[in-house]
Design a protein with these regions (language model features):
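Short beta-strand/loop motif that positions the catalytic acidic residue
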Residues: 309, 316-318
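Gly/Ala-rich beta-loop-alpha elbow adjacent to hydrolase catalytic centers
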Residues: 248-252, 256
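Alpha/beta-hydrolase fold nucleophile elbow
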Residues: 238-249
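N-terminal pre-domain segments of enzymes
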Residues: 23-69
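N-terminal cap/lid segment of alpha/beta-hydrolase-fold proteins
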Residues: 76-128
């Protein structure tokens, strides 16, 4: 009898898990009236949807140009014409005699100081050129400290190490130079306050609202910051310009996707728990408000961001237990990107992998891909 009950429980669990990841079950459903409305307005013109029958390089140039415009990056560039970022060093320390971690502040636009950590392996010959890993974080107010292994206290350390979140520190311990920057609107150092809780007591949403009325988006601000940090970093003779890697989890993954699509200096891109279609097939919006781009569906979708990254190295990683994303929508998007890479005879440079857990980094998947990518670049 006990054995029968046990087998019944196992069967029910299997059924539950099967249904949870069923390709036939929609991630979210809406009432028909709402569903019809969303389907009608969200279809979009998808003007820059990838088309295998057009000139690929010309498509990339035009799609990239328009993307820069609609996110507001062009406006930031125009508004800041003549502005020169400045950098100050805040603190330098040697960690366990293994690497040097230096905190900098970069003024990316007037009055905006974006902190970032630079991690450099210790006791390396200065003439040796290193890969560079750039790793913006997502919704973590201590994000740059988390990624850099600069923990606030023991609780913070245990939390981050428990989910493999010290990605910039992992990189430097593997002999790379790494940068862990604050993500504007998400790190406590560069938040936009939400007085009176008008925007739901969410600084990232407050950032979005202030950006929208100014003709820009948080995504544009964040891409701009990453590009200014890259401009500075690539003046360092120790960095191999052909081995620039970018990764981030969640909102940091979204930023990785957009930066990689817009900036060809990124040679290896690894967006984690973030790279999926803008909406589900029923109209559900997957990403945070602060990632919203007005009119993006008239431009295209994440599939086309992947097309702008092609044929550079791209690994898309998701957690199978991540409740923020839909397996069917992730795979629909990544299958379309695989087809683009196949058209470019670059199938070996793109991969999609599922981690066994939830919304986190998967170093066991990421580092082998990075090592293989760097080996391919160095040939």
């Amino acid at each position: 009898m006990n054995m029968h009950k046990t087998l019944t429980c196992v069967y029910l669990v299997c059924i539950f898990v099967s249904k949870s990841f069923s390709q036939d079950s929609p991630f979210v459903t809406y009432p028909k009236k709402t569903s019809d409305y969303l389907k009608r307005i969200q279809t979009g013109k998808a003007k820059y949807k990838y088309n295998p029958n057009i000139n690929f390089k010309e498509w990339q140039i035009e799609a990239r140009k328009e993307l820069s415009k609609i996110i507001g990056l062009d406006k930031i560039t125009q508004d800041l014409e003549g502005f020169k970022p400045s950098i100050i060093q805040i603190k330098e320390e040697t960690i366990d005699d293994k690497y040097i971690r230096t905190l900098y502040h970069i003024e990316t636009e007037p009055g905006i100081q974006v902190p970032f950590y630079l991690l450099v392996p210790k006791n390396r010959q200065l003439r040796e050129k290193h890969p560079l890993l750039l790793s913006p974080h997502g919704h973590d107010v201590d994000g740059l400290h988390s990624y850099a292994g600069a923990y606030i206290n023991k609780s913070h350390r245990d939390k981050i190490l428990g989910r493999d979140g010290n990605i910039a520190e992992q990189a430097v311990l593997k002999g790379m130079i790494s940068i862990a920057p604050a993500t504007r609107g998400l790190a406590k150092e560069v938040l936009i306050p939400d007085p009176k809780g008008r925007h739901g007591n969410r600084p990232c949403r407050a950032q979005l609202m202030h950006c929208l009325i100014s003709g820009r988006t948080p995504t544009a601000e964040r891409v701009w910051d990453m590009q200014k940090i890259l401009d500075w970093a690539l003046k360092d003779s120790r960095i191999n310009r052909e081995m620039i890697i970018m990764t981030g989890n969640s909102g940091g993954g979204v930023l990785t996707a957009y930066t990689s699509a817009l900036d060809e200096r990124i040679k290896v891109s690894l967006p984690s728990c973030s790279f999926t279609s803008i909406t589900s097939n029923t109209g559900y919006i997957f990403h945070c408000d602060c990632c919203a781009i007005p009119g993006i569906k008239d431009w295209g979708d994440f599939r086309d961001l992947g097309g702008l990254i092609a044929p550079r190295r791209l690994l898309i990683v998701h957690g199978i237990k991540d409740g923020l994303h839909s397996k069917i929508d992730v795979e629909r998007t990544t299958d379309a990107i695989k087809a683009i890479y196949s058209d470019r005879n670059a199938s070996d440079k793109m991969s999609m992998r599922w981690g066994k857990s939830g919304h986190k980094f998967y170093p066991d998947i990421m580092w082998p891909f990075i090592q293989k990518a760097l080996a391919g670049i160095s040939k």
